[in-house]
Design a protein with these regions (language model features):
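Extracellular beta-strand ligand-recognition surfaces/modules
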Residues: 1-14
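Short, compositionally biased P/S/T/A/G/V-rich stretches that sit at domain boundaries
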Residues: 18-44
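Solvent-exposed, conformationally flexible loop/turn segments
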Residues: 47-51
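Short amphipathic, basic-aromatic surface patches that mediate peripheral association
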Residues: 54-65
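Short coil-to-beta strand junction motifs in C2/discoidin
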Residues: 65-72
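Active-site mouth of glycoside hydrolases
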Residues: 72, 133-135, 151-309
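Beta-strand signatures of extracellular beta-sandwich domains
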Residues: 74-76
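Extended acidic/polar, glycine-enriched regions
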Residues: 82-84, 89-166, 185
Length: 309
């Protein structure tokens, strides 16, 4: 069943080249999705394992904002015991809607589409410096100090330090995973919400889902390096829902089905679409394909690496 409706404002899911002076400005911090409230001394206090998201405007010159070779945003983070770099990303906002029990995602005007999304995983002082690199130009901005206080969240799920055959959370609590596959993100009814809720109600604490071309895969446009923002919005929702329900996610990044039959003919890595591969096997060996795939991995880490589950 098709449904047509009015569109609010201009929708630009395609890539729009940018031609402005280099700038990095209007930075806002959100903590667990809410605007941060600095203390009187300017310090922002958060709890351990809170999700921090910096939203900002970035200007410069590029053809594709998803290509870090053209423009890249990075946060240099100094916590109580270490210093590390964390990648940023470009995104477009979507709003989840339902029409006759069918889920749709409507594009929305996106204020401050450049983001840094990370988790405060260590108590103590935390400082972030943002850096944007655009060709030979670069700009840095130091951000207000953050104080991370200990909380009661379990933290990231990792291999157990006692027995690597099992899992444990950062707080030392063990975890035995019980769950099943959800290979396709279903947009009929309120799935995956209903399915995930039933799983949690019955004691399941993990699931596996695919980033395939007909589900949550983001790199499936007319050429490599163009990321489907509607699929990314669905994955944002999926990760938030599973985190709320205490369900850990095995995110399957690819499927062989996208490299056979009609799907290979549609695959953006196929040479007929400006890709790098004459045949599916080339995807594993061509240096250009490997380089492009690393860019996608960078985007995945930047957008969803914050998730403790």
């Amino acid at each position: 069943r098709l449904r047509f409706g009015e569109r609010d404002g201009d929708y630009q899911d395609h890539i729009v080249p940018k031609r402005t002076p280099l700038r990095l400005q209007d930075v806002d911090l959100y903590v667990n999705g809410n605007p941060a409230a600095p203390a009187a001394d300017g310090t922002i206090r958060v709890r351990q394992y809170d999700t921090l998201e910096y939203r900002m405007e970035v200007g410069g010159k590029w053809e594709n904002p998803y290509d870090p070779d053209q423009v890249s945003l990075t946060a240099n983070v100094t916590s109580a015991s270490r210093t590390y770099s964390y990648p940023g990303f470009y995104m477009l906002d979507f709003q989840r809607q339902f029409h006759d029990s069918v889920e749709t995602w409507a594009p929305q005007p996106t204020a401050k589409p450049w983001r840094i999304r990370l988790t405060a995983d260590e108590p103590g002082p935390m400082r972030c410096q943002l850096r944007v690199v655009n060709g030979r130009k670069r700009k840095t901005v130091a951000l207000p100090r953050i104080e991370v206080v200990a909380g009661n969240k379990r933290g990231f799920l990792r291999s157990s330090q006692t027995d690597p055959h099992y899992f444990q959370y950062d707080n030392g609590e063990g975890c035995f995973l019980i769950g099943h596959n959800l290979p396709i993100y279903n947009n009929i009814g309120k799935a995956p919400d209903t399915i995930l809720q039933r799983m949690a109600d019955n004691g399941e604490n993990c699931c596996r889902i695919w980033m395939s071309s007909d589900s949550l895969g983001i790199e499936w446009e007319d050429r490599p390096g163009r990321y489907r923002q509607e699929s990314a919005a669905r994955l944002d929702h999926f990760m938030a829902t599973t985190e709320r329900l205490g369900i850990n996610v095995m995110l399957c990044l690819d499927t062989h089905q996208d490299f056979v039959g009609q799907r290979w003919l549609d695959n953006p890595y196929n040479k007929v679409h400006g890709g790098f591969c004459k045949k599916p096997q080339d995807w594993f060996t061509r240096k250009a394909a490997q380089k492009q795939y690393r860019k996608r991995l960078r985007y995945l880490v930047a957008r969803w690496g914050y998730a403790t589950n």
